[in-house]
Amino acid sequence: MGNIVDYVRTDFRTFAEHPFSAVDSLVLSELSYIRLPLVVPVFGAARSIDTIALTGLLRAEDFPMMFAADSQQVNSTRLDLLVAVAESPRFRGLRVGEYIQRDDVDREQQFAAMTFDLGDCTGIRGLFGPGGLLYVAFRGTDGTLLGWKEDFNMAFRCPVPSQESAAKYLSSILDRSAGVPGGDAPAVMVGGHSKGGNMAVYASVRMAARDLDAMQWLADESGESQLPMIEATSMAGRRTSDKQLRIGSADPGDAGNISRGVQDNQNLPTDSTTQHVQPAQRNRYAARICRVFSHDGPGFPKRLESAAFDAVASRVDKTVPQSSVVGMLMDDGLPHRVIEADAVGIMQHLGMSWQVQDGEFVAAPGLSATAMFAGSTVNAWMLGIDPADRRKVIDELYVIFSTPGYRSFGELAEHWTTALPVIIDATRKTDRETRRLVAGVLAALPATAWRNLPQVPQLVIDSLR
């Protein structure tokens, strides 16, 4: 047994010998955490999908920028993964591009995505046809307070800005990779870790909703009352009815362009659900999405009871570790597989701890008692108060942890001797419910972001309860 780095280093089978699996998906999802350099084509700059060979990322002068978002240990492991993938005969031919990154404090958004082209990897075209395979990867939450805030915003709002951006991104990739009429378009897989998994599911459901809208238009024009089935390229979807998806639209301000961040890319469509697309073109979107991967990704505030969700659900492969907390938040009813991990507690959320044997995840007997307790407790809190109160508490938490002036939990941990008193002082000015939640966060942080602390003094935590 080993982790995904060990897997890539030692498993030299081609995709013809061992088809694409959830382990391969986690490999690409982990690579999406890397902050790609300027050499990588930006999103939407070309009419077709623009990529470079993954080996083009192996430039030492770029590494300080590429691996600067998380702890030194995590960054080092991701560099090991990148080098292993670049050297691996299984992934030889892998390309990456269509990179976009946006960190927007005003909109409380942390979003990044990239597209991997596996068409030149040995065995892929034999499995997926001459068009090959694209894997759209959405980055999960990094260690920033901004990313943490958007995650918690999901408790009272759907969609959050990153979910909307994910739908627009996926729509554009599907549009621009369709090729000429009669040509062979690549199959598409979508996935991500943590929040990235949630965005993968949401974006895919939005594409299915577009298909249903288009087919309803065709049915109305032809006088048919029964909508046809939406099927995946290589995995059949469920039969759908004429029930339509109605996901809340984004705030009016969400219609603005999306930037790459430091590279100022502004090419996401302003509204992918209303741009003019002929029905004959629109009804291909969900059919080209053959699988959707959510690696310990949270669900939605309420289950998306819709034909579009049902059309996608059979293609979703959700995996969670034994001590999953994040992946069990806002449980949406999607089946999940429980995976062995060699970390302790909430640290199992890190995909690098998941155990792999013979190219597949090692199955665990079920969720741990701690995970079930934590999940039920947090979900009970979310369901126990109305969305307005949830928003108030979450906003207060964000203000409190932002008060010391640091961008990430890592920086807070590094400067804890000055940051902690500021946090405690700000917390004491809030109501009892907020103080209790802050105490809970502080109690959990030694196992996560506050690694530099031997422990948060229990007296400090008790004083906030």
Annotate the PLM regions.
Residues 2-20, 33-36, 54-84, 90, ...:
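Alpha/beta hydrolase fold serine-hydrolase catalytic domain that processes acyl esters and thioesters
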Residues 201-205:
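Short glycine-enriched nucleophile-adjacent loop
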Residues 192-196, 200, 275:
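Gly/Ala-rich beta-loop-alpha elbow adjacent to hydrolase catalytic centers
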